[in-house]
From Swiss-Prot:
NCBIfam families: PRK04313.1. Belongs to the eukaryotic ribosomal protein eS4 family. One of its GO terms (cellular component) is cytosolic small ribosomal subunit. Residues 43-106 form the S4 RNA-binding domain. Keywords: Ribonucleoprotein, Ribosomal protein, RNA-binding, rRNA-binding. This is Small ribosomal subunit protein eS4. SMART domains: KOW, S4. InterPro entries: KOW, Rib_uL2_dom2, Ribosomal_eS4, Ribosomal_eS4_central_region, Ribosomal_eS4_central_sf, Ribosomal_eS4_KOW, Ribosomal_eS4_N, S4_RNA-bd. HAMAP family: Ribosomal_eS4 (MF_00485). It comes from Nanoarchaeum equitans (strain Kin4-M). One of its GO terms (biological process) is translation.
């Protein structure tokens, strides 16, 4: 039997993080292209424009906006209507002076937080991988797939603040006590906590972090947080 590649998702099968009704647009909804974000933390740009922002009535209008360079993601025009726009990405429509950052609300749903033009030049992420390369350098990989070279000063799970579209690092946030962290899974999803302790566990279990959120102290897996700067607002 031939194998067919599905171009759409059943609307009932969309991730629970997507802020669209599970029966929206009938039986099917646009499936995201492969990208650095998992489906849990990203939606196709067409869904953001049509179903969330209401800037298009149909896919024809979505394609018009994209093909005419009216929509930017992280400062660059996007043509692919299935392009995944995910956590911390910056979605911009300069023609109408609208700028947004993808975040999670306290229900665990993705949403677009309105930001100003200056803030749209900044992005947040986390180091998820580090490997040695030629020349004695270390290559670091961030949550959105970007990479940079450096010495061995940083560790995985450190937060990073950088400029877009020209990738320039502004700050690296260590994973340490009293640093702020953005929570992406669990009871306090979408909120900012203060790190109280990082608890190392035996392999293969991930490490645990103890956080204080709104006066309440709790624990979660280290993979569920991203260190952020002091001025970060959810």
């Amino acid at each position: 039997m031939p194998t067919y590649i599905k171009r759409h998702l059943r609307s009932l099968a969309v991730p629970r993080t997507w802020p669209v009704p599970r029966k929206s647009r009938g039986y099917w909804i646009v499936k995201p292209s492969p990208g650095p974000h998992s489906k849990e933390f990203a939606m196709p740009i067409a869904v953001w424009l049509r179903d969330y922002l209401g800037l298009a009535e149909n896919m024809r209008e979505v394609r018009y906006l994209l093909n005419n360079g009216k929509v930017l993601v992280d400062g660059r025009p996007i043509k692919d209507y299935k392009f995944p726009v995910g956590l911390f990405d910056v979605l911009a429509i300069p023609e109408i002076n609208e700028y947004y950052r993808v975040l999670l609300d306290e229900r665990g749903k993705l949403y677009l937080k309105k930001i100003d033009k200056e803030e749209a030049n900044i992005k947040y992420g986390k180091i998820i991988r580090k490997v040695s390369v030629r020349g004695g350098k270390i290559q670091y990989t961030l949550t959105d797939g970007r990479t940079f070279l450096g010495d061995n000063s940083y560790k995985t799970h450190y937060g990073v603040v950088y400029e877009i579209p020209n990738f320039k690092i502004r700050e690296v946030i260590p994973l340490e006590k009293d640093r702020k962290a953005y929570i992406i899974r669990g009871k306090h999803t979408g909120r900012i906590g203060v790190i109280k302790e990082v608890i190392k566990t035996d392999m293969p279990w991930p490490n645990i972090v103890r956080l204080e959120v709104a006066g309440e102290v709790g624990e979660t897996w280290l993979d569920n947080i991203i260190p952020v700067p002091e001025n970060f607002e959810a």
